[in-house]
Amino acid sequence: MCGYYGNYYGGRGYGCCGCGGLGYGYGGLGCGYGSYYGCGYRGLGCGYGYGCGYGSRSLYGCGYGCGSGYGSGFGYYY
């Protein structure tokens, strides 16, 4: 599950911040593999490359157990 509704609720999904949408999702504006903000392999706030990863924290909070919860945008680790 990737949390389709996560786009509007901080991206509560697995792996990233939902699937598609304005701010979150694979290849979306704020999330996805190799996107710019928030999540993905080389995201601004999270992902495998920049500032986040497995069990890490970040400003935007995405990825596996990263930032704030398991693949969510706002919530748990903070």
Swiss-Prot record:
Subunit structure as annotated in this protein's UniProt entry: Interacts with hair keratins.
Function of the protein: In the hair cortex, hair keratin intermediate filaments are embedded in an interfilamentous matrix, consisting of hair keratin-associated proteins (KRTAP), which are essential for the formation of a rigid and resistant hair shaft through their extensive disulfide bond cross-linking with abundant cysteine residues of hair keratins. The matrix proteins include the high-sulfur and high-glycine-tyrosine keratins.
UniProt entry tagged with the keyword RNA-binding: no
25 X 2 AA repeats of G-[YCGS], as annotated region: 3-76
Induction description: Expression in skin and hair follicle is regulated by HOXC13 and by GATA3.
Organism: Mus musculus
The entry's keywords: Keratin, Repeat
Protein name: Keratin-associated protein 6-5
GO BP terms: keratinization
Chain coiled-coil ranges: none
Top-level taxon of the source organism: Eukaryota
Gene: Krtap6-5
Family: Belongs to the KRTAP type 6 family.
Presence of keyword Cell membrane: no
Tissue: Strong expression in narrowly defined pattern restricted to the lower and middle cortical regions of the hair shaft in both developing and cycling hair. During hair follicle regression (catagen), expression levels decrease until expression is no longer detectable in follicles at resting stage (telogen).
Listed GO CC annotations: intermediate filament
Cross-referenced InterPro entries: KAP6 (IPR040313)
